[in-house]
Amino acid sequence: MSAEAMNMNMNQDAVFIPPPEGEQYERKEKQEIQQTSYLQSQVKVPLVNLPAPFFSTSFSAQEILGEGFQASISRISAVSEELSSIEIPELAEEARRDFAAKTREQEMLSANYQKEVERKTEAYRKQQEVEADKIRKELEKQHLRDVEFRKDIVEMAIENQKKMIDVESRYAKKDMDRERVKVRMMLEQQKFHSDIQVNLDSSAAGTETGGQVVSESQKFTERNRQIKQ
């Protein structure tokens, strides 16, 4: 194998590997506050930090062209001179074009990703606003229902208290009627007994008189007879 052929093989195996560049997605925080009847929404875009992919061959050109390859060449052609990687303008230009194309594709993917994230975030925010508005309206309805419920309870309590007072007064009146009847019955059955004695003394004569009065209600007696019958 000639030296020119070996140089061609070495140039074909040589690969230009551009220095790896780490790409970080800046954290983008989007905050929108829209207040409609105490409705507040806050959007935070999740932080995504993905390292740029790095591709490399199993062996670099210098490893392929190092001492190990030199030993095999020396056995074939008995050439002991050291070999090194050679920079070829055509391959370097191709590598630069590939790197530029890779950068453009990555930037396009990143831009599309950001647009998709913003679109989904905006859709989610609008959905959350709709749900929050529904919840707010339902809570307002619940508040009105609570107010009506409390009014009903208070009115029921007042009405019940009035009924309790009416019952109490009605039975108190019955108790008073019974007491009046008892007093009247006691007066009707009561017997009046009086002893009367009069003594008159004068210079001419002395006079003494006496009497007894017993009084009993005839009305009570007749009522007792009716009750017994």
UniProtKB/Swiss-Prot annotation:
Keywords: Coiled coil, Cytoplasm, Repeat, Stress response. Disulfide bonds: none annotated. Residues 161-179 are annotated as: CAHS motif 2. Its main location: cytoplasm. Residues 202-218 have a biased composition (Polar residues). Residues 219-229 have a biased composition (Basic and acidic residues). Residues 109-145 form a coiled coil. GO terms for cellular component: cytoplasm. Residues 124-142 are annotated as: CAHS motif 1. GO terms for biological process: response to desiccation. Residues 1-29, 202-229 are annotated as: Disordered. Trehalose, a disaccharide essential for several organisms to survive drying, is detected at low levels or not at all in some tardigrade species, indicating that tardigrades possess potentially novel mechanisms for surviving desiccation involving tardigrade-specific intrinsically disordered proteins (TDPs). CAHS proteins are cytosolic heat soluble proteins that seem to contribute to the anhydrobiosis in tardigrades, but their specific mechanisms are yet to be identified. It is possible that protection during anhydrobiosis might occur via the stabilization of vitrifying small molecules such as sugars, but not via the direct glass transition of CAHS proteins themselves. Belongs to the Cytosolic-abundant heat soluble protein (CAHS) family. CAHS proteins contain 2 repeats of 19-mer peptides designated as CAHS-motifs that comprise each two octapeptides connected by a tripeptide. This is Cytosolic-abundant heat soluble protein 107838. The lineage of its organism: Eukaryota, Metazoa, Ecdysozoa, Tardigrada, Eutardigrada.
